[in-house]
Amino acid sequence: MNACINPYPYPAEISFNKAFNVGRLLHDSSAKNWIKEWHIKENLVAVQCFPLYSILLALNQTTVDFFSLDVEGDELQVLKTIPFDKVNIKMITVEYVHQTGTVDELNQFMVGKGYEPLIRMHKDDGTVTDVIYSKKS
């Protein structure tokens, strides 16, 4: 499937900036400002994006053992589209470095959805900036 995870709860065609390991959707002003702040050259392509829940339903798979989310800044917005009462994701790794908001806001959201942060991983060079969450039993 050639598609992306949509930060909105509906399908849409969105511009994606191809930029090696920091490519991202350009769907709002904060994403566009991020591209400018990081001095990233624009190299746009239109991509079809779907909410994660729609993809899981199409695959008839609403239980996920492990989900890694790294979308260069839209992590919390993507998580907010997931109906956690209808999907059983047992463990989630979320990159937090490029997102709008703080890691504390991310933790607060995930705890509110029934998850506990297990570990916050961080390397000073920025290559590892993730939190691992486990669903509470």
Per-range role (PLM):
Residues M1-S137:
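Phosphate/nucleotide-binding beta-alpha loop and adjacent structural elements of enzyme active sites
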